[in-house]
Amino acid sequence: MDNCIFCKIIKKEIPADIVYEDKEFLAFLDIRPLAPGHVQIIPKKHYRWVWDVPNIGQYFEVVKKVALAQKKAFQTDLIRSQIYGDEVHHAHVWLWPENGSGAKENFKENSELIIKNIK
């Protein structure tokens, strides 16, 4: 999709603080974070809704991997998740640590913490 901001991030036309990337999926820090380490996880192929992603099991394995990294990175037991779709018409899952440590505006530090804890 030519006007999709997430597709532009995938193509590296728009910069993003990427915390995870593989052949199928990309995870990056939200530019308007609700909390330190707030991440968007998207498929690299454009799908309108999460439920349209054919390899949804693999998608949620990535969601789990990022959530577990956030849990360690921000020293919290609670990672919130939400599936949206109205604001950007590209499948995406939000993940953010509840009551986590750190400042939400520290993009570089927050991305490094998540990357360090992804297994």
Q: What does each model-found stretch correspond to?
A:
Residues 1-119:
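HIT superfamily nucleotide-processing domains
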